[in-house]
Curated annotation (Swiss-Prot):
Name of the encoding gene: rplU
GO CC terms of this entry: cytoplasm; ribonucleoprotein complex; ribosome
GO molecular function terms attached to this record: rRNA binding; structural constituent of ribosome
Keywords noted in UniProt: Ribonucleoprotein, Ribosomal protein, RNA-binding, rRNA-binding
Protein's job: This protein binds to 23S rRNA in the presence of protein L20.
Name of protein: Large ribosomal subunit protein bL21
Recorded superkingdom: Bacteria
Annotated organism of origin: Thermosynechococcus vestitus (strain NIES-2133 / IAM M-273 / BP-1)
Keyword RNA-binding set for record: yes
Quaternary structure note: Part of the 50S ribosomal subunit. Contacts protein L20.
Length: 111
């Protein structure tokens, strides 16, 4: 099974064709396609291609499924004996993408 390690949103992610992943919000409408060219590593059935920093000629293509929000994270700050309390919540904006295929030098490795 071929897989790739990509960089998106300042994070590294191991992706495989046919699976979906939640990444940082991307400025692409749902049902739109995306080509991720910041590929750090590509693993085929017989070889490993490691980039320095990126693998040249490697592209991971996918489809934007939907935009969503992550789970709520509560931040609570309190100073004892002072009646000072601060409660904040945060939900991260995410984009769910379906990985269609991994291409290396124009040749499809999966999908």
């Amino acid at each position: 099974m071929a897989y790739a390690i990509i960089e998106t949103g300042g994070k590294q992610l191991r992706v495989e064709p046919g699976r979906f992943y939640d990444v940082e919000r991307l400025p692409i409408e749902p049902e739109g396609t995306i080509d991720l060219e910041q590929v750090l590593l590509v693993q085929t059935d017989s070889q490993v291609h490691v980039g320095q920093p990126y693998v040249s000629g490697a592209v991971v293509s996918g489809t934007v499924m939907e935009h969503r929000r992550g789970p709520k994270v509560i931040v609570y700050k309190m100073r004892p004996k002072k009646k000072t309390r601060r409660k904040k919540g945060h939900r991260q904006e995410l984009t769910r993408i379906m990985i269609n295929e991994i291409r290396l030098n124009g040749e499809s490795l999966g999908g």
